[in-house]
């Protein structure tokens, strides 16, 4: 594959463009002169977050990218957005997925979905802001419209999944990857944040993005 010319990083739920992994990728890519963008999914309102809005923001970021191969790097819920964005935008020619939340399941942070539906909002801890914030049930309703398992993705995909992930079931990721020969799944001994695997993730992503040959 040709070297990627532009990378768009899609951060996870209750995270931000200042996440440690986003910052690491931006710094490393700058050494190669690769342009970088990271939409802020907390804006204009975290409370009103939906997958559809995240996809719209990703569309705008892809549209603003320089000409040439574009890679999406998605973390957790950002990875869910990345796989759906990839089928919508031909400019995207490869994906890196980090602990991909391929379905919302029981909701974020051990949410009681029935209670969330009844009250219309969920109180969660926002890691980037280090405080509790509300998010509306519209996030869960909207996410249910999107099925990552039904997507026909032909582009190369590199996936990193922790075997000790407490938020994303590793078996779900393995099942998603099993029927897709274009997916290179790397299981690592790590938790959801993949903090202990950042060096390995960059090393393999560097090659996958065409920046360093084996």
Label the predicted regions:
Residues 2, 64-68, 152-153, 212:
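Glycine-rich phosphate-binding loop signature in dinucleotide/nucleotide-binding domains
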Residues 47-65:
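Alpha/beta-hydrolase active-site loop
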Residues 9-13, 73, 98, 160:
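Short hydrophobic segments within beta-strands
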Residues 29, 85-89:
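Aromatic pocket-lining residues of Rossmann-like dinucleotide-binding sites
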Residues 91-214:
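The alpha/beta-hydrolase serine catalytic core
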Residues 2-43:
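Short, surface-exposed "cap/lid" segments of acyl-processing enzymes
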Residues 73-82:
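Gly/Ala-rich beta-loop-alpha elbow adjacent to hydrolase catalytic centers
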């Amino acid at each position: 594959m040709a070297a990627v010319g532009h990378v768009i990083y899609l951060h996870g739920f209750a995270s931000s463009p200042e996440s440690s992994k986003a910052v690491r990728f931006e710094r490393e890519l700058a050494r190669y002169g690769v342009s970088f963008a990271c939409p802020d999914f907390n804006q204009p309102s975290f409370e009103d977050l939906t997958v559809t809005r995240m996809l719209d923001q990703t569309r705008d970021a892809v549209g603003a990218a320089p000409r040439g191969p574009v890679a999406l790097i998605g973390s957790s819920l950002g990875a869910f957005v990345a796989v759906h964005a990839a089928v919508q935008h031909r400019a995207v020619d490869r994906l890196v997925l980090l602990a991909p939340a391929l379905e919302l399941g029981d909701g974020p942070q051990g949410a009681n979905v029935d209670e969330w539906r009844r009250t219309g909002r969920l109180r969660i801890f926002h890691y980037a802001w280090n405080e509790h914030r509300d998010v509306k049930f519209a996030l869960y309703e909207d996410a249910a419209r999107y099925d990552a398992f039904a997507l026909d993705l032909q582009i190369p995909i590199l996936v990193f999944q922790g075997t000790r992930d407490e938020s994303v079931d590793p078996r779900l990721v393995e099942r998603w990857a099993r029927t897709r020969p274009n997916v290179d799944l790397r299981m690592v001994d790590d938790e959801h944040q993949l903090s202990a695997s950042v060096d390995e993730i960059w090393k393999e992503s560097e090659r996958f993005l065409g920046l360093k040959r084996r």
